[in-house]
Design a protein with these regions (language model features):
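Flexible, D/E/H-enriched segments
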Residues: 1-83, 105-230, 241, 260-344
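Active-site microenvironments of hydrolase-like enzyme catalytic domains
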Residues: 88, 92-111, 255-256
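Nuclease catalytic cores that cleave nucleic-acid phosphodiester bonds
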Residues: 224, 237-248
């Protein structure tokens, strides 16, 4: 009998590195030649940002940030193990990994038989590792088929086009197995084109400072929060009538400093994230479904679109969060949100 567990985590890339490098994105953004002089040194930063930076360029704060994130990842893994899913469907962004110039779908279900990837070098675990996980092609094909029947023209793939596995998915697996006890659950990656107008123009990454990307060079936009909310609802509806126990997992941070131009790419739009966090906590689905693509871009929240899928799924399931956490920061690039919502 079908059961669904709803989860949300961050796949924050610097977590797999060492604490003394956790603030490397901020350091890169400080090289922006257009940065106001007052912001080039901590003396001109907001006071909480200076405090988090400290006198060690954020190393001590990085240890605390890591402890907060790993604590939530451990709680999420415990919920996953207690649920014992038949597979884990992960909504994650593709940052110029398989969505490249040859094809950029709005979203794509990876119906892989096997999922293989390697850990990044110089990682916190001290060794290079290869991962080989089962996919769940049967479930992925059924989901794609029924989404099409419900009016969502879902792209699908039987093998990766460029990158073996995007980091939103690889990091989710590595972080949920942070203590290296093993992760054997079949995985169905569900990639979302969160980066939209900058997925090719900016290669889904950090801003470029040696030239200006004109409006004419920008790409077509990402799917709207409304469309992805409805996609998540349809996904939950389809899987609720399936024979499987499924964990639905959103994998991403929220506002990213390097996408938030109004903050000079130095810190995330935490107030905007707080508003959406409160709406998720309160099951205010209208706020999520009516959120605009323009607001997403203005606040550097491109990756929150993964969570729009999760919000839609929770709405369809009439599911309330059981546990939630908001880990904020000024110097570590992004707000991180965690959610656990088991069957009631």
């Amino acid at each position: 009998m079908a059961e669904i567990l709803a989860l949300g985590i961050s796949h924050y890339p610097p977590l797999h590195g060492h604490d003394d490098r956790m603030a490397w994105i901020l350091k890169r953004m400080l090289q922006n030649p257009k940065l106001p002089d007052t912001l080039r040194t901590p003396a001109g930063w907001p006071e909480p940002m200076r405090a988090e930076w400290g006198n060690d360029e954020g190393a001590a704060s990085a240890a605390r940030h890591r402890a907060d994130l790993v604590g939530w990842l451990d709680r999420t893994r415990a919920a996953l193990d207690a649920f014992k899913p038949d597979f884990v469907l992960i909504w994650g962004d593709d940052q110029y990994e398989n969505f490249r110039e040859d094809v950029v779908p709005p979203y794509c279900i990876a119906a892989y038989d096997r999922i293989q990837f390697t850990s990044p070098s110089t990682n916190i675990w001290g060794k290079d590792e290869g991962f080989d996980l089962p996919g769940h092609r049967t479930a992925a094909k059924r989901l794609a088929s029924e989404l099409i029947e419900e009016g969502f023209d879902a792209a699908y793939a039987y093998k990766p086009l460029h990158n073996p596995l995007g980091h939103a998915f690889a990091n989710a697996v590595m972080y949920l197995d942070y203590h290296r006890k093993g992760f054997d659950y079949p995985v169905v990656p569900f990639a979302i084109n969160c980066y939209g107008r900058r997925v090719l123009a900016q290669r889904g990454g950090l801003p470029v400072f040696d030239r200006t990307i004109s409006d004419a060079e920008l790409d077509p936009p990402a799917p709207t929060p409304r469309r992805l909310f409805d996609l998540g609802a349809a996904t939950a509806r389809i899987l609720a009538r399936s024979p499987w126990r499924v964990a639905l997992l959103a994998s991403s941070g929220w506002s990213h400093a390097f996408l938030t131009a109004k903050n000079h790419f130095l810190w995330p739009d935490t107030p905007a994230d707080r508003r959406m966090y409160e709406a998720l906590r309160d099951c205010d689905w209208q706020t999520w479904r009516s959120y605009s693509g323009a607001a997403v871009e203005d606040s550097g929240q491109q990756e929150i679109l993964n969570w729009a899928c999760l919000a839609g799924a929770m709405s369809e399931l009439k599911r309330k969060p059981k546990e939630m956490g908001f880990v904020d920061t000024w110097i570590f690039n992004s707000s991180k949100v965690f959610l656990i919502a088991p069957p009631q």
